[in-house]
Amino acid sequence: MTGGSGAVAGGVSGGTATVALSLASAAIWGTSDFVGGIAARRLPSSAVVTLSHSLSLAMLVSLALLHRSTWPDTPSVIYGALAGLACGTGVMVLYKALSLGGMGLTAAVSGVLAAVLPVLWAFVTEGLPRVPQIAGIVLAAVAIWMIGRAPGSPSSKQAILLGAAAGGSFGCLFILLKLAGRGGVLWPLAWSRLASATLAVIVTWIATRRAGGVKRDATPMLSWPGWPVLGLIAIAGIFDASGNTFYTIATRLGRLDIAAVLSSLYPASTILLAAVLLKERTTRSQAAGMALALVAVVLISA
């Protein structure tokens, strides 16, 4: 293991900002997933990602130009593009799961796996954090499972595979955004969005061909979704890109494991929005998980 006490000290520096930005990214990502999941009930998930990520790409490029951000080095561009592929894969799988009417086991598996991968990476590359932070990370992982897992969720092989695919993709995304962020924020994120949008276009094209082309009565792949759905897609794209921005800044200021674990609490805001707007019932396990998440945040911030 590398880093030792120096890594621990580095984790304390900027710790408050890292916690705040990571929690903000979790809230924003959860909102994006909620809105995107609703849109994915009207359009294929790949089409939702194509439109939302294309819009957010334009937003990121515009912000980078207005901010006169420095062009990133080659490694940051490569890491950013790889992060985009991971993001595009994870979001399409997650939107597909959400469009089926609930998160259940898929959300629980994806949330925990998304947090575990960057935590292990950080332990190797940055050294162990302080004891209270380790305890907070463990509690946060348990909270993520409790929040995402709902009683009665089908424990099918498909649910587990979808959860593992989404979680593995998001875990890689967390690591790659940390690496890409060394060369800046906006331009690496723009490259990430370009890669994810391109991947979604390819997936949409393949799915359309398999469906027999663009036929009004056969596939909704490229049909007009209506302004309300487009509005939801726009919100999903803007919020997702904003969450990526906050998370990347958080990793620049503090430890990867702390940023990733706290950001992985995104299902909480999705469930809260579903409870308020869709009147979906929050279980006792989910409520306990949210309370446990608060304890984890306190320990991590200590």
Residue ranges, per PLM feature:
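Membrane-interface interhelical linkers
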Residues: 2-27, 35-36, 40-46, 51-81, ...
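Hydrophobic/aromatic positions within or immediately flanking transmembrane alpha-helices
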Residues: 22, 46-50, 80, 104-108, ...
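Residue positions within transmembrane alpha-helices of multi-pass solute transporters
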Residues: 27, 31, 62, 89, ...
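Hydrophobic/aromatic residues within transmembrane alpha-helices
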Residues: 39, 48, 97, 123-129, ...
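Alpha-helical transmembrane segments of compact multi-pass small-molecule transporters, enriched
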Residues: 54-60, 109-123, 195-199, 243-246, ...
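Hydrophobic transmembrane alpha-helices of multi-pass small-molecule transport proteins
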Residues: 55, 60, 116-120, 129-149, ...
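Alpha-helical transmembrane segments and their membrane-interface exit regions
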Residues: 85-90, 138-149, 195-203, 267-271
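Selected transmembrane alpha-helices and immediately adjacent juxtamembrane segments
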Residues: 158-186, 228-229
